[in-house]
């Protein structure tokens, strides 16, 4: 459809129809205008797979590795292939827009959404996310809602905006979602600064800006470039509010036309005007080629951080008995929580993968070793609803106090429900009651947990109990369990999408299971085995969108049961290998006692197979850390300035400025604050030589001109493997301005057979040498001598060659 066609269509819309298109119809779809054959558009989460409309028990979907795992590959081509596959998956859910990727720069290791994002480095984030977006489009947190983030213009430009700038200029995404929080005193959608001046004017972006499930203002958002409010139905853009703003002149119809035009352009981009049929049914399509891609990508992202005595890969010929231990040994931790959660086609746990790969050739013994519950598991056994069917009866009432007759009833087999996808139309006030008859099979003082999105009460045989309780049950007796919940009074200052929503979870664990001595059992099994594999990490309860982590440690934070497990097992067996599944670094107090350590991230539905491929040597680990790994949280640049729960002002000051990640740790090298593992670090089963580095071209008269580093890389070992050549630039000193010691300029990954050698070329341009000059609001390259480091990590010991070039005349350029 031409621009003229879109303008004609715009003129045919009535004012009320245009206002309707300013916001969504429901949680995932926009309005259709049948009179003009304008179709509805469906969007879907998330960054690691197309989940579909149902948040709970939805149509099965394919779960890909998290973006932090993808970042560890340093592989642009792989990111493009993942994007292509996600485009195909999006279509199976009847959607035309995938709400991903997340490209926030990692500022703190306790950020709850780090796993969804790529890296602490804006260049690595921007280049890999660009390929992800290009591939996708080729086919078709702690009170983050109100926090005011105070950031210098230089830090914004050099660190936090840079990855977005790279993506916009390289991949031209069709949609961008805005954040909830303020930046320097203003909500993102309440000022023309970001959406209009930076995105559209400076960078020339022409896509659609939508809210990340909640917006803060009607007038400001319409005037300042926010095109679509999601989810629907409209709240801040309700028809009466927009008409009122039009009447008193705070918003013009021209403003509305600009917003609707962007929406129509998006419909055209995704082909909806060629495919005007109603939203297709969601389908579960499990493609073998996507299975293989996920397994490949998951293994490529695994980072080997320790391999004492070459304990890995496991020598199956000499190993007779392997202990598989840990809370995540038989639990496939495929993804983090929040938008990344989904109902997968399947998930392979490490224990399942070991058994399927080695069969009877090796004896396996298993122990869970530690409990890491935050909320206890669902109560599934021995529960009967009032109708006599297994499960729970849920009754919904049109007030806050369970008065009158329920307007809807449901039966669920799980002890969890949410109205986010259970009821399409909800009253202005609502409460619910969930009941069951519970007949336990064993006696004991069993454990229960309760959580809810509003005021929630648990009754057992009519008695009110606390949120987390132990209750003495007799085997075979019947107990009436009742949960009552009323609607939360959610506001923008809390959790926008939970306004007028109800969610409840009841958890249960028998006393015998909770109180067993897991540590002793694990130690005994480890002692009698040739090698002990300990699988640790986070679950969706501990690492999720919507909440930051309470500490840079393995959970539970109070008991530290996972750390105790590793220490106990390593004391029993020196051949202990830890495989950790988290989206961020954690403290490693046991590291000196473990023989091996793999960081596996969230590798998707093939996670167990990907881990097995690396442990058994079928895949040579080539992952590199996309962030620095601190020894303790106190060593990070943002310590004391992350989150604001203890601050009345609700302000977070980015006092570290541009010194994020390795830019910070470079200041502290060879001190007690030196990073435990540097950015870009990762071990291999083979060895590499990096020699004969040279440099060509260093005059940048335009953005198109590049400088090329050529280097010879040889595989000097006896296994095929891959190395990542990382090129860093060290700028000359500037009086009165501190710059990072070095910054990543570019990188390249090379795959080599044993004894093979290749020449690798790595290009970078003037952006790599520039800093943001706040005095003139331009990028500036100063004259002087620049040092180029050719390295295999950001650590000084991993620099393989030093080159230099001279800039005789400085230059400035616009964003």
Model-derived regions: residue spans:
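A short, compositionally biased
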Residues: 783-784, 807
């Amino acid at each position: 459809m031409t621009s003229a066609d879109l303008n004609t269509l715009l003129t045919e819309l009535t004012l009320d129809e245009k206002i309707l298109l300013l916001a969504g119809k429901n949680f995932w779809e926009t309005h259709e205008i049948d009179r003009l054959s304008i179709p509805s558009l469906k969007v879907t989460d998330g960054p690691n797979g197309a989940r579909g409309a149902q948040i709970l028990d939805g149509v099965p979907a394919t779960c890909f590795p998290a973006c932090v795992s993808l970042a560890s590959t340093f592989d642009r081509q792989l990111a493009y292939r993942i994007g292509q596959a996600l485009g195909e998956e999006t279509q199976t859910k009847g959607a035309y827009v995938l709400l991903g990727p997340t490209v926030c720069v990692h500022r703190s290791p306790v950020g709850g959404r780090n796993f969804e994002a790529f890296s602490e480095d804006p260049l690595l984030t921007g280049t890999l996310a660009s390929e992800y977006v290009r591939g996708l489009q080729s086919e078709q947190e702690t009170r983050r809602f109100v926090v005011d983030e105070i950031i210098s213009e230089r830090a914004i430009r050099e660190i936090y905006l840079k990855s977005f700038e790279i993506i916009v200029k390289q991949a031209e995404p069709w949609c961008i979602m805005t954040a909830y929080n303020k930046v320097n005193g203003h909500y993102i959608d309440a000022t023309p600064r970001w959406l209009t001046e930076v995105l559209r004017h400076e960078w020339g972006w022409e896509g659609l800006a939508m809210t990340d499930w909640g917006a803060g203002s009607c007038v400001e958002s319409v005037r300042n470039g926010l095109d679509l409010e999601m989810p629907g139905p409209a709240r801040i853009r309700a028809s009466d509010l927009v008409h009122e703003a039009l009447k008193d002149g705070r918003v013009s119809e021209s403003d509305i036309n600009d917003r609707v035009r962007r929406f129509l352009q998006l419909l055209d981009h995704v082909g909806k005007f060629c495919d005007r049929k109603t939203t297709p049914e969601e389908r579960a399509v499990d493609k073998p080629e996507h299975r293989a891609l996920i397994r490949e990508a998951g293994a490529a992202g695994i980072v080997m951080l320790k391999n004492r005595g070459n304990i890995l890969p496991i020598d199956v010929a000499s190993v007779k008995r392997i202990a598989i231990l840990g809370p995540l040994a038989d639990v496939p931790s495929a993804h983090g929580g929040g938008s990344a959660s989904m109902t997968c086609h399947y998930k392979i746990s490490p224990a399942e993968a070991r058994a399927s790969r080695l069969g009877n050739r090796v004896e396996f013994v298993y122990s869970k070793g530690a409990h890491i519950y935050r909320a206890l598991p669902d109560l599934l056994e021995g529960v009967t609803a009032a109708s006599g069917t297994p499960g729970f009866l849920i009754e919904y009432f049109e007030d806050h106090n369970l008065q009158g007759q329920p307007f809807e009833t449901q039966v669920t087999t799980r002890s969890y429900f949410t109205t986010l996808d259970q009821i399409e139309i909800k009253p202005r006030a609502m409460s619910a009651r969930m009941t069951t008859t519970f007949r336990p099979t064993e006696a004991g003082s069993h454990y229960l947990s309760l959580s809810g999105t509003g005021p929630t009460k648990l009754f057992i045989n009519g008695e009110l109990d606390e949120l987390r309780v132990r209750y003495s049950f007799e085997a075979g007796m019947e107990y009436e369990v009742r949960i009552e919940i009323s609607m939360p009074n959610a506001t923008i200052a809390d959790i926008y999408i939970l306004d007028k929503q109800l969610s409840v979870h009841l958890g249960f664990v028998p006393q015998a299971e909770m109180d067993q001595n897991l540590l002793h059992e694990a130690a005994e099994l480890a002692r009698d085995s040739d090698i002990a594999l300990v699988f640790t990490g986070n679950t969706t309860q501990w690492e999720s969108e919507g909440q930051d982590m309470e500490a840079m440690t393995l959970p539970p934070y109070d008991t530290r049961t996972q750390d105790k497990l590793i220490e106990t097992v390593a004391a029993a067996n020196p051949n202990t290998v830890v495989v950790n599944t988290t989206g961020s670094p954690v403290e490693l107090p046991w590291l000196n006692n473990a023989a091996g350590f793999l960081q596996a991230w969230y590798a998707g539905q093939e996670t167990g197979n990907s881990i097995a491929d690396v442990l058994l040597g079928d895949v040579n680990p080539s992952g590199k850390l996309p962030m620095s790994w601190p020894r303790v949280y106190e060593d990070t640049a943002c310590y004391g300035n992350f989150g604001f729960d203890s601050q009345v002002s609700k302000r977070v000051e980015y006092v570290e400025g541009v010194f994020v990640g390795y830019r910070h740790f470079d200041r502290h090298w060879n001190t007690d604050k030196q990073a435990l593992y540097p950015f870009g670090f990762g071990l291999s089963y083979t060895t590499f030589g990096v020699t004969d580095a040279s440099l060509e071209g260093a005059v940048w008269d335009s953005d198109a001109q590049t400088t090329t580093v050529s280097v010879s890389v040889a595989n000097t070992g006896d296994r095929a493997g891959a190395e990542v050549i990382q090129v860093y630039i060290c700028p000359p000193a500037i009086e009165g301005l501190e710059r990072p010691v070095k910054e990543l300029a570019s990188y390249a990954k090379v795959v080599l057979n044993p004894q093979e050698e290749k020449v690798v070329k790595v290009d970078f341009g003037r952006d790599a040498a520039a800093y943001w000059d706040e005095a003139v609001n331009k990028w500036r390259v100063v004259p002087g001598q620049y040092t180029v480091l050719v390295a295999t990590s950001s650590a000084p010991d991993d620099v393989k060659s030093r080159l230099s070039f001279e800039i005789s005349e400085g230059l400035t350029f616009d964003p």
